[in-house]
């Protein structure tokens, strides 16, 4: 019994930033099987939540970040978080990013991986496991 409590306390934390509610709920249901999940639906909320958790000493281990959010682009969010000694970021998009943008994001280590929608749920679990 004690080890299971320890396992729960030591679960990794994954944040999902997705402005489409159905996808946000779907991704979180899959990831909640293995991780503690924080759901946000805008770039501003993502940055705010990251800063709040960091200030409380409750770091987020991985961020799944949609590229095209209602209030800003995912690459801008990724850059801001990485400049604050950020976390590992997986960028997700229904759009194929142009090569110069992808190259900049990878070369400057703003993101660890890029996933193109539609994404299979087992792919999300696999990518999360590889990243953290």
Could you tell me what each predicted segment is?
Residues 1-15, 21, 51, 120-132:
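Non-catalytic signal-transmission and effector/linker regions of two-component phosphorelay proteins
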Residues 21-39:
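Two-component/phosphorelay signaling modules centered on CheY-like receiver
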Residues 41-62:
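Acidic, metal-coordinating helix/loop segments flanking the phosphotransfer/catalytic sites
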Residues 66:
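Active-site residues of response regulator receiver
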Residues 70:
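The feature encodes the CheY-like receiver
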Residues 75-87:
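Short amphipathic alpha-helix used as the core "switch/output" element in two-component signaling
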Residues 92-94:
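Hydrophobic/aromatic residues positioned on beta-strands within the core alpha/beta folds
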